[in-house]
Curated annotation (Swiss-Prot):
Gene from which this protein is expressed: ureB
Any single Gene Ontology cellular-component annotation: urease complex
Keyword check for Transport: no
Alphabetically ordered keywords of this record: Cytoplasm, Hydrolase
Chief localisation class: cytoplasm
Keyword Hydrolase carried by entry: yes
InterPro entries per the UniProt record, alphabetical: Urease_beta-like (IPR002019), Urease_betasu_sf (IPR036461), Urease_subunit (IPR050069)
Quaternary structure (record): Heterotrimer of UreA (gamma), UreB (beta) and UreC (alpha) subunits. Three heterotrimers associate to form the active enzyme.
GO molecular function: urease activity
PANTHER family, A to Z: UREASE (PTHR33569:SF1)
The protein, known as: Urease subunit beta
Cellular localisation: Cytoplasm
């Protein structure tokens, strides 16, 4: 093995199998590009992104870890989101949750 080399099993790797997903239409009404990373709590994404926020609470982009989606000014697109797993607690970002996703508005 070479240092830093990644060896994966043969065949396709499916991400987020069996997780709840959601499709959302998003538009960038800002004057600058907005980039959202793979594990960013989409509910708390930049306010220049216009979409129905309430249903996205507890969801992130359904894309490979370490990647992002960029929304250019004036651009609209539909993205696939996937529910957070594990403890389902969210801290940081814009500070809109700061704890458990369930049982809080």
């Amino acid at each position: 093995m070479i240092p830093g080399e990644v060896q994966v099993a043969a065949g396709d790797i499916e991400l987020n199998v069996g997780r709840e997903t959601l499709s959302v239409s998003v538009a960038n009404h800002g004057d600058r590009p907005v980039q959202v990373g793979s594990h960013y709590h989409f509910f708390e994404a930049n306010d220049a992104l216009v979409f129905e926020r309430a249903p996205t609470r507890g969801y992130r982009l359904d894309i490979p870890a370490g990647t992002a989606v960029r929304f250019e000014p004036g651009q609209a697109r539909t993205v696939q989101l996937v529910a957070y797993a594990g403890k389902r607690e969210v801290y940081g970002f814009q500070g809109k949750v700061m704890g458990a996703l369930e049982g809080r508005a």
